[in-house]
UniProtKB/Swiss-Prot annotation:
It comes from the Bacteria. It is an enzyme of class 1 (oxidoreductase). This is FMN-dependent NADH:quinone oxidoreductase. The lineage of its organism: Bacteria, Bacillati, Actinomycetota, Actinomycetes, Mycobacteriales. FMN binds at residues 10, 15-17. Belongs to the azoreductase type 1 family. Keywords: Flavoprotein, FMN, NAD, Oxidoreductase. Binds 1 FMN per subunit. It comes from Nocardia farcinica (strain IFM 10152).
Length: 216
C-alpha cells in the first residue's frame, strides 16, 4: 500500500503552494484509493526548533559511525534527550513510512519558511539515505527566479531544497512544480505580468495533477 506524506508550510489557509500541493494530493488519492495519506500542516501545528539535547543525539550518531535509523532510540541517554526524541520520533516515523513526500512551500525572503526548516532539522541525521523515496515540492514565489531571469541567482528556495535532499537524504531527483510571479495578484508594479503568473499557476496545477497520477 503506497503512502504519501504531504507537508504544508504556508501560513495562509488559502495559498498558491497549498493549491498546487492539493492538486497533486487529490490526484494521487484518486488514483490510489487504497493508499495511505498523511498530512502535516507545519504552519498550523509548528514543529519546535531543535535544542541542545537534539544536538547531543546527533553527536552520538556521529560517534557511532553512521545512521542506523532503527537504532536511533538506543542512542538516547538522558531525560532531556528523551524529551527531544519524543518530538523527533513521530516526525521521523511519518517520513520513513512514506513512498512519496510532497512539500508545499512558498518562497520567503529568497528561501523557505522557518516552519519547514524546523521540520527538516528535526528529521535529519548524519549519513541518512531516503532513496528511492520520491520527493515533490509544490512551490510558489512572488517574483520570477527562473534560469536566465535577472534574479535567478537569488533563488535559495529550489536550490537549497534540491541540495538539501541530495546531500542529506541521497535523493537526487526531486521534482519542483512552481508557480512564479504570485505578487502580480497584489503588487501594482507587477500588474503587467499578471497573465504570466496566471499561465505559470495553471501550468503548475496541471503538472501537479499529472504527477499525482504517476507517483507511487
Amino acid at each position: 500500500m503506497p503512502t504519501l506524506l504531504h507537508l504544508d508550510a504556508s501560513p495562509r489557509r488559502r495559498s498558491i503552494s497549498r493549491d498546487i500541493g492539493a492538486a497533486f494530493a487529490d490526484s494521487w488519492r484518486a488514483t490510489a484509493p487504497n493508499g495511505h495519506y498523511i498530512h502535516r500542516d507545519l504552519a498550523a501545528d509548528p514543529v519546535p526548533f531543535i535544542d541542545a539535547a537534539w544536538t547531543e543525539i546527533c553527536d552520538a550518531v556521529l560517534a557511532a559511525g553512521g545512521t542506523d535509523l532503527a537504532a536511533l532510540p538506543t542512542l538516547v541517554r538522558t531525560p532531556a534527550q528523551a524529551a527531544a526524541w519524543r518530538i523527533v520520533e513521530p516526525l521521523l516515523d511519518e517520513l520513513l513510512a512514506a513512498d512519496v513526500v510532497l512539500i508545499g512551500t512558498p518562497m520567503y525572503n529568497y528561501s523557505i519558511p522557518a516552519a519547514l526548516k524546523a521540520w527538516l532539522d528535526q528529521v535529519t541525521f548524519p549519513r541518512m539515505s531516503l532513496a528511492p523515496r520520491r520527493f515533490v515540492v509544490a512551490a510558489a514565489r512572488g517574483g520570477s527566479y527562473s534560469p536566465g531571469t535577472p534574479k535567478a541567482a537569488f533563488d535559495h528556495q529550489e536550490r537549497y531544497l534540491r541540495d538539501f535532499f541530495a546531500g542529506h537524504f541521497a535523493v537526487t531527483d526531486t521534482v519542483f512544480v512552481t508557480a512564479e510571479l504570485a505578487n502580480a495578484r497584489q503588487d501594482p508594479a507587477l500588474a503587467a505580468r499578471r497573465a504570466e503568473h496566471d499561465a505559470s499557476y495553471a501550468d503548475a496545477l496541471d503538472t501537479a495533477r499529472r504527477l499525482g497520477k504517476e507517483y507511487r
